[in-house]
Amino acid sequence: MRKRPDVVVVGAGVVGLSIAFHLAERGASVSVLDRSGIGAGASGVQPGGVRQQWGTRVNCLLAREAMRFYADAHELLRMRVDPGFRACGYLFLAHSESALARMRDNVSLQNELGIPSRILTPAETAELVPGLEIATVAGGAWSSEDGYFDRPQSLIEAFGALADVQIGEVVDVCDEGAVRLAAGGELQADAVVVAAGVDTPRLLPELPIRPEARYLFFSEPIRERLLEPLVVSPERRFAAKQLGDGRVLAADLGALGDPEAELDDWRANIRGAFEVLLPQLVFVPLPILVEGIYDVTPDHQAILGRVRDRVWVAAGFSGRGFMLAPAVGRIIAESVIDGQEDAALSVLDAGRFAEGRLMPEPQVV
């Protein structure tokens, strides 16, 4: 290892790399440690979606800030590859009046914070998504600013190119600001930030983070455009979109790693949703399966901030690390370097679990 850095960041996913970027922007020397390399974990398989439609104030604000960063990422990260953002929109469908009422509450909050989402009638959802069957649709929530990146990995690589990333497995985090390595020895620093996703509780066992599997099915590229916005049905636990290269992506959001379940069961659930909602996709084969892992907390909210004297954490994102990473990077960097405590840290701190201050995020996909 090289000379002693000011800060060690454990984890070279998009969250850890964003933290390293913002720390360096504030003049800190930073070493990023990861046992497998840049974007080798969940960041490497996430499909690149970004949205501002959330059900809690803190996530709406973080997502809004992150979207502004990503809009300028080409310049900020000195990118040589266009990540290819497509503002196709996210459409959330409601199939009951109670679900629609919750969507109205979410949209009211989002509008208050400057997010241009709106409630749609069933007929309006059908106009937005040609071919959508609305017999079971009570309404929807929509924002045209949401979308996805064709090449999300280019953003992760751009963050990584600006960081000092070293291959190394961390086996222990010391309260005094050091990490112990599997290869032997320690790396000393003034502060340590753990952004290791599902690996975080191995290093910080006091944190209630658990792994939860997610499964994405992909078709081969299709020339015909069959589905432009991303369509999510929380009640049917289903989501689908067509990517820029023509592949159709579909997810059975109820497939949570049940060892008794079979791939054919998950495909059957997706086929059932296609038949009821998107019949134009019924005959699209989905031969490719990608498995990812969410790092999940009891309230499906991230854990951010200081957890020990010289140790900070940014983990437990339930699949939205990519969506929030730029804002999280700024917040953690300000806390570590300047001692500034962003409002998000007061609601996403680790102490909320023991104190009963849980704030469930209802809009997890």
Regions found by a protein language model. Give the residues of each.
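Dinucleotide-binding Rossmann-like beta1-alpha1 core, especially the glycine-rich loop
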Residues: 47-128, 237, 257-259, 274-275
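Active-site substrate-recognition segment that forms the wall
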Residues: 21-25, 50, 81-86, 196-309
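Short beta-strand to alpha-helix junction loop
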Residues: 61, 93-102, 142-158, 261-266
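Glycine-rich FAD pyrophosphate-binding loop
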Residues: 24-44
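Core beta-strand elements of the Rossmann-like FAD/NAD(P) dinucleotide-binding domain
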Residues: 3-5, 182-191
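Helical element adjacent to the flavin cofactor pocket in flavoenzyme catalytic cores
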Residues: 142-177, 181, 190
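N-terminal Rossmann-like FAD-binding beta1-loop-alpha1 element of flavoenzymes
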Residues: 7-31
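C-terminal catalytic lobe of FAD-dependent flavoproteins
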Residues: 278-365
